[in-house]
Curated annotation (Swiss-Prot):
Belongs to the universal ribosomal protein uL4 family. PANTHER family: 50S RIBOSOMAL PROTEIN L4, LARGE RIBOSOMAL SUBUNIT PROTEIN UL4M. InterPro entries: Ribosomal_uL4 (IPR002136), Ribosomal_uL4-like (IPR013005), Ribosomal_uL4_dom_sf (IPR023574). Keywords: Ribonucleoprotein, Ribosomal protein, RNA-binding, rRNA-binding. The keyword Acetylation does not apply. One of the primary rRNA binding proteins, this protein initially binds near the 5'-end of the 23S rRNA. It is important during the early stages of 50S assembly. It makes multiple contacts with different domains of the 23S rRNA in the assembled 50S subunit and ribosome. Forms part of the polypeptide exit tunnel. NCBIfam families: rplD_bact. Coiled coil: none annotated. This is Large ribosomal subunit protein uL4. Gene3D superfamilies: 3.40.1370.10. Part of the 50S ribosomal subunit. The gene is rplD. The keyword Ribonucleoprotein applies. GO terms for molecular function: rRNA binding; structural constituent of ribosome.
Length: 201
């Protein structure tokens, strides 16, 4: 199959298996959920009655005071006591094998092509690290919510995009299922497309 280059009167021949496969919604959902779960910090923690600071002494005698019986100031019933079912740090990551991950990326890229959300250009750069230059370039292309993927990190482009809302710049190694889905359009250079093909082959 061929992808038309937006900034040149030519087309780029690409693999049908990478950019023309059926959309596997279940697989994409599983991989996206796993990716998001892996990004969780998972460091929350609370203290049980065994861990909170305080004496182990019985606050007052069992009988004769008229007060409710009590055995510890660290009881979960008390203010400043421990938590009954205290949260523990945990690893939320889910296993996704390479074949599934690559399959999900291929499904997403193919769907982007079908929905005309993938824009392929010969090259994409700015002369200087100026936000104004990139903002004007995107305005000329009628783009405002866009992920720009280049074959290698372009420092000028990266610095120019940092202060633009809903604009992100990645190299091929930095793309992931969530970022491909999150943006309205994906602009990819011809070299980046070839690299993606090799990576997912």
């Amino acid at each position: 199959m061929e992808l038309v280059l937006k900034d040149a009167q030519s087309a780029l021949t690409v693999s049908e298996t990478t950019f023309g496969r059926d959309f596997n919604e279940a697989l994409v959902h599983q991989v996206v959920v796993a990716y998001a779960a892996g990004a969780r910090q998972g460091t929350r923690a609370q203290k049980t009655r065994a861990e909170v600071t305080g004496s182990g002494k019985k606050p007052w005698r069992q009988k004769g005071t008229g007060r409710a019986r009590s055995g510890s100031i660290k009881s979960p019933i008390w203010r400043s006591g421990g938590v009954t079912f205290a949260a523990r740090p945990q690893d939320h990551s889910q296993k996704v094998n390479k074949k599934m991950y690559r399959g999900a990326l291929k499904s997403i890229l193919s769907e982007l092509v079908r929905q005309d959300r993938l824009i392929v250009v010969e090259k994409f750069s700015v002369e200087a690290p100026k936000t104004k230059l990139l903002a004007q370039k995107l305005k000329d292309m009628a783009l405002d919510d866009v992920l720009i993927v280049t074959s290698e990190v372009d420092e000028n482009l990266f610095l120019a995009a940092r202060n633009l809302f809903k604009v992100d710049v990645r190299d091929v190694a930095g793309i992931d299922p969530v970022s491909l889905i999150a943006f309205d359009k994906v602009v990819m250079t011809a070299d980046a497309v070839k690299q993606v093909e090799e990576m997912l082959a």
